[in-house]
Structures are given as structure tokens and as C-alpha cells.
């Protein structure tokens, strides 16, 4: 939902909307997504426990669909809204239709620690797709080239059990090829 608002709330999980309004927002999009022949739904860049709960309720009502869940954890420790990963795992981890849990839209340097934390609270397969490493400056609305000039080593991610690895903001096909 936060990316839809384009107000930065996708980075904080602080939505100026009621739970009912959030349910209404996602219900229509969920119905449209489920009408198609999709095998797996990607529920990604989720910054808020309330949004995760809303989406899990929709998933529970659609037993023929499966999904992976990817979290927004910009501080490298918790969900963007401050919710612990243990709490998120308790909400997500016991659902048969959740195929994997992980993180996306974050600096590559934060991925390993978050995957270790998630692995400590769930046995679900792990996923990670990090940004390029550049930093978004919300004041100027520009990317700052702060990324190290070296490829990301995903070997430690794989060792923790990460099975899906990709790229998010500002990554290129060449970046993805280097991850393979």
C-alpha cells in the first residue's frame, strides 16, 4: 500500500488509513490478481504488521493460491513499523500457503543479518532481493551513488538457506547475472 501513496510510508509502515480501508484497498487488487493463471503471488516490500495480517487473511480465503512474503526492514533488525521478526514469523509461518519468507528493497549489507534472524524463527524457505546499494534521498528525490564498486557475495545468503535471490531497486540485468 505504501508505494501506492508515494509519500514514503512504504519505508515506515505508518499508513494514514484504517485497517478496514486497507482491507478494502487490498481486496480489489487481490481479486484481480487471483483471476489470472498465476502460480504464486509475490507479497513484497511489506513494511507493516497490519498490512501483513490483512494479506494473510486474504490468502486464507483463497486456498487455491500460494504466496511468498517479503518484508521491508530498512533498519536491518525489524519490520519498518518496528514489529519484531518473531511476531511476523508467528503471523506468516504457520500458513500452508506461504511458500517462503524473506526481505527485499534494502541495502545488500543488511540482508545476511536479517536472513539469520528470520531463520532463527521459522523453517520456511528464505528469499532476498536487495537494492543496488545506492541510497534514496527523499529530500531531493534522487538516488545517491553510495554503492560499493564490488559485486554482492550471496554465498552467505545461500548458506543460511536463501533459495530465491534477486534484485530490487536500481539493480540491472547485469547485476542479476552476477548473482547467479
Regions found by a protein language model. Give the residues of each.
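Domain-level signal for soluble alpha/beta catalytic cores
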Residues: 1-180
